[in-house]
UniProtKB/Swiss-Prot annotation:
It comes from Arabidopsis thaliana (Mouse-ear cress). This is Cold shock domain-containing protein 3. It is found in: Nucleus; Cytoplasm. Disruption phenotype: Sensitive to freezing. GO terms for cellular component: cytoplasm; mitochondrion; nucleus. Belongs to the cold shock protein (CSP) family. InterPro entries: CSD, CSD_CS, CSP_DNA-bd, NA-bd_OB-fold, Znf_CCHC, Znf_CCHC_sf. The modification N-acetylalanine is found at A2. One of its GO terms (biological process) is response to cold. Residues 13-76 form the CSD domain. Pfam families: CSD, zf-CCHC. Mostly expressed in shoot and root apices, and siliques, and, to a lower extent, in roots, cotyledons, stems, shoots, leaves, floral buds and flowers. One of its GO terms (molecular function) is zinc ion binding.
């Protein structure tokens, strides 16, 4: 069994960082030595085991089984127990996610999200943190990000997910100022070209419900075919061509008039028996003529 080589001498230092949520922190020795790792289980306390930033503590130095030094038997100066209260050490929900200090939350932090204590500066506290969805930096969540809609601030964020509208990083599609126009995304270029096409305009980078070219029809692209006019880039409910012109393109025949490009429920001639000659392929069961059905036939059987 691996044993820890403990030193009989006790040292004094100050807490440089501690996270209640993670259960560990670091102590800077007063003699200027290297920072020491301290685990929550090594704290001698009458209450909740925690340390406060800048707090003076007394401890022993031990060599762990991993070959690294750490602080154990951490007490108040003089060997007394650290009297920690549950509400005093975690009154604001533990350490701030931005700067690591206690007493406030990340959304109220004045330290920002720079690389000094929690950012992507390669320090000991950057490795385990997730990346902000807005700017790509570490040390805070997207809801606390101060670069919410910038676009320019997150461009080099590395690791930020691309905006669904413009393909850039640093913001979400709902906050995008680039819109879904053709100048940035409509041409199919950029990193979003492999996405599904908008059902309205055929472009990529946005959904039909967010499309700004609702009735366009001239954008083309890979959209689905309109049931009314046979064109692409929009759906039948927003089509401005109620009756197809020319060779209406492969639609089913309307049950009311026999024409193509629309359904019976949308037919402009619904219920009128005078609309013969619709070009339909169905014949009236009563008179044998095309253009109407038996229920609308005016001929006496």
């Amino acid at each position: 069994m691996a044993m820890e080589d403990q030193s009989a001498a006790r040292s004094i230092g100050k807490v440089s960082w501690f996270s209640d949520g993670k259960g560990y922190g670091f102590i800077t020795p007063d003699d200027g030595g290297e920072e020491l790792f301290v685990h929550q289980s090594s704290i001698v306390s009458d209450g909740f085991r925690s340390l406060t930033l800048g707090e003076s503590v007394e401890y022993e130095i031990a060599l762990g089984s991993d070959g690294k030094t750490k602080a154990i038997e951490v007490t108040a100066p003089g060997g007394g127990s650290l009297n920690k209260k549950e509400n005093s050490s975690r009154g604001s929900g533990g350490n701030c996610f931005n700067c690591g200090e206690v007493g406030h939350m990340a959304k109220d932090c004045d330290g920002g999200s720079g690389g000094k204590s929690f950012g992507g500066g390669g320090g000991r506290r950057s490795g385990g943190e997730g990346e902000c969805y807005m700017c790509g930096d570490v040390g805070h969540f997207a809801r606390d990000c101060r670069q919410s809609g910038g676009g320019n601030s997150g461009g080099g964020g590395g690791g930020g997910r691309p905006c669904y509208s413009c393909g850039e990083v640093g913001h979400l599609a709902k906050d995008c100022r680039g819109g879904s126009g053709g100048n940035r995304y409509g041409g199919g270029g950029g990193r979003g070209s492999g996405g599904d096409g908008c059902y309205m305009c055929g472009g990529v980078g946005h959904f039909a419900r967010d499309c700004r070219q609702n009735g366009g029809g001239n954008v083309g692209g890979g959209g689905s075919t309109c049931y009314t006019c046979g064109g692409v880039g929009h759906i039948a409910k927003v089509c401005t061509s109620k009756i197809p012109s020319g060779g209406g393109g492969g639609g089913r025949a309307c049950y009311e008039c026999g024409g193509t490009g629309h359904l019976a429920r949308d037919c402009d001639r619904r219920g009128s028996g005078s609309s013969g000659g619709g070009g339909g392929s169905n014949k009236c069961f009563i008179c044998g003529k095309e253009g109407h059905f038996a229920r609308e036939c005016t001929s006496v059987a």
